[in-house]
C-alpha cells in the first residue's frame, strides 16, 4: 500500500516536471505573437513578463524547485535566435562580418554556460563539492534549499540555469553573462536597425530612430517585439553583472588569492 502511494506521488511529480519543462516553449512564442498586435499590447505583454520574473524572484527559495525557469531561459534564447536567423537575416541588410561576430559571441555564450552546468552537475553529484545535509555545516559550506545538498564554496543558486554557482564554475557563469550581454546588445541593435529607420551614431555604427511602421507587417512586428524582449534581458543581465562586480567577484578573487597563498606556503 505504502509503495503504491509513493509510486503515485512520484508519477504526479514527474508529470508536473514534464509540464513545467514544456510550458515555456509554448507560452513564450504565444506571448511574442500576441505582442505583435500593437505597441500598446507589446508594452502590456512585456510588463506582464517582467512582473512575472519579479514575482518569481521574490518567492521563497524552496518554492522555485522547478525546471520551468531553466526551460524559460532556453526557450528565450532559442526564440530570439530563430527570429534573428529566419526574420532579420532574411532582409539581407546585415553584412557577413556582423553576422560572424554575432555567431562568435553566441558560441562563447553557449560554451560558458554549458561548462558552468557541466561543472556543477559533476562536482555536486559525483565530485567533492556537494553532499547530503549534515546538521553541522563546515565554515565553507552552505545548504542549498533548491538542490537539497550541502554545497562547499557556494556563492548562490541560479534558478534560471537550474544549478548552484560556486567557486569552480563561477568564472564560467561570469564570462557567460558578459558574452550574453554582448550577444544581445549586438543582436538587438542589428535587428532594430534593420527593421526601423536607422541613424548613424559614429562611423559605421547605427542606432534605430523611427520604428513607427513595424506593426504594419507581421514579420517586422515579430522582429521588433523580439528585440524589445531582448532589451529587457539586457537590462536584467546588466543588473546581474553589477551585482557580481560589487558582491561576488570580490569574494571569488578573495577565495582564489587565499587558495594560491596557502598553496605557495
Give residue ranges: language-model regions:
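Hydrophobic alpha-helical transmembrane segments that serve as membrane anchors
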Residues: 1-128, 168-265
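Short, flexible, mixed-charge glycine/proline-rich loop motifs
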Residues: 131-139, 148-152
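Short cysteine-rich clusters marking metal-coordination/redox-active sites
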Residues: 132, 144-147, 158, 164
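Secretory pathway export signals and precursors
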Residues: 140-143, 160, 207
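Short, non-ligating residues that shape and space the ligands of small metal-coordination modules
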Residues: 153-156, 167-170
Amino acid at each position: 500500500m505504502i509503495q503504491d502511494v509513493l509510486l503515485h506521488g512520484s508519477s504526479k511529480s514527474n508529470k508536473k516536471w514534464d509540464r513545467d519543462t514544456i510550458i515555456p516553449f509554448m507560452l513564450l512564442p504565444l506571448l511574442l505573437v500576441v505582442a505583435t498586435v500593437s505597441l500598446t499590447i507589446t508594452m502590456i505583454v512585456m510588463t506582464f513578463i517582467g512582473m512575472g520574473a519579479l514575482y518569481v524572484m521574490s518567492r521563497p527559495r524552496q518554492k522555485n524547485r522547478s525546471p520551468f525557469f531553466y526551460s524559460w531561459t532556453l526557450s528565450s534564447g532559442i526564440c530570439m535566435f530563430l527570429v534573428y536567423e529566419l526574420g532579420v537575416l532574411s532582409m539581407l541588410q546585415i553584412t557577413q562580418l556582423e553576422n560572424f561576430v554575432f555567431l562568435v559571441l553566441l558560441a562563447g555564450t553557449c560554451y560558458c554556460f554549458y561548462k558552468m552546468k557541466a561543472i556543477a552537475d559533476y562536482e555536486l553529484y559525483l565530485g567533492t563539492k556537494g553532499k547530503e545535509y549534515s546538521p553541522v555545516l563546515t565554515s565553507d559550506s552552505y545548504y542549498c534549499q533548491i538542490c537539497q545538498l550541502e554545497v562547499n564554496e557556494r556563492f548562490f543558486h541560479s534558478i534560471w540555469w537550474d544549478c548552484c554557482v560556486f567557486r569552480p564554475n563561477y568564472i564560467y557563469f561570469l564570462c557567460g553573462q558578459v558574452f550574453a550581454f554582448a550577444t544581445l546588445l549586438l543582436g538587438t541593435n542589428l535587428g532594430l536597425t534593420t527593421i526601423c529607420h536607422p541613424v548613424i551614431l559614429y562611423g559605421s555604427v547605427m542606432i534605430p530612430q523611427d520604428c513607427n511602421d513595424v506593426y504594419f507587417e507581421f514579420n517586422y512586428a515579430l522582429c521588433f517585439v523580439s528585440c524589445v524582449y531582448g532589451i529587457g534581458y539586457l537590462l536584467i543581465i546588466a543588473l546581474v553583472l553589477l551585482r557580481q562586480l560589487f558582491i561576488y567577484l570580490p569574494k571569488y578573487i578573495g577565495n582564489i588569492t587565499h587558495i594560491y597563498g596557502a598553496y605557495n606556503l
